[in-house]
Amino acid sequence: MKKSMLKNGLLLGLFALLCTGLVAIVNQLTYAKIKQQEQIELSRVLHQIIPDEIHDNELTEHCITIQDSDFLGTTQPLPAYIATRNGDGVAIAIETVAPDGYNGNIKIIIGLNKAGEVLGVRTLSHQETPGLGDKIELRKSDWVTKFNGLTVSSEKDKRWHVKKDGGQIDQFTGATITPRAYVNAVKLATLYFNEHKQKLLSAPASCEVDNE
């Protein structure tokens, strides 16, 4: 009887061990696949906001970490990606956060050239209202392309407001909070770059990039 119980216990233990091992293997494979897809999507977005013809490096491989709660909307460190040509920094893609969206944080990435001109803007994540605030997604609206070619002269640059507030950027029909927060976030991130451009464009890669 005792031998039978011991045998059954060993079998159950072995079965549990095998199941745990299989789950760990599946999780590892799934994680690697997810990370690979994230890198592919990141590379796609980066090449949308920084034209291929102005740089000769792979943007995801020159990542630096930036942090400034006053200009980047969060106390957390954020990645930025340096575009180089012949080893010289020519543009940057900066991740930033609009903390005051209608439904919370809006994560944004902005491409800027050395002159501080906006090359492109994309929304990385948000929880804005479908049909209203989600016009910040390129697949829903071309609104984010309105930033292309813009520069910021100072924090008081009056152009950098939605038209309802006296600026030059359109708001959405039935939604003002989302575009207002978005415009301010892009403006502040651009000002951050203008203030630190020499240091940023010459910075060596300093954050880990998972290329699995």
Curated annotation (Swiss-Prot):
The keyword Transmembrane applies. Its EC number is 7.-.-.-. Its main location: membrane. GO terms for biological process: electron transport chain. GO terms for cellular component: plasma membrane. Keywords: Cell inner membrane, Cell membrane, Electron transport, Flavoprotein, FMN, Membrane, Phosphoprotein, Translocase, Transmembrane, Transmembrane helix, Transport. It is a single-pass membrane protein. GO terms for molecular function: electron transfer activity; FMN binding. It is an enzyme of class 7 (translocase). Belongs to the RnfG family. This is Ion-translocating oxidoreductase complex subunit G. It comes from Shewanella piezotolerans (strain WP3 / JCM 13877). The gene is rnfG.
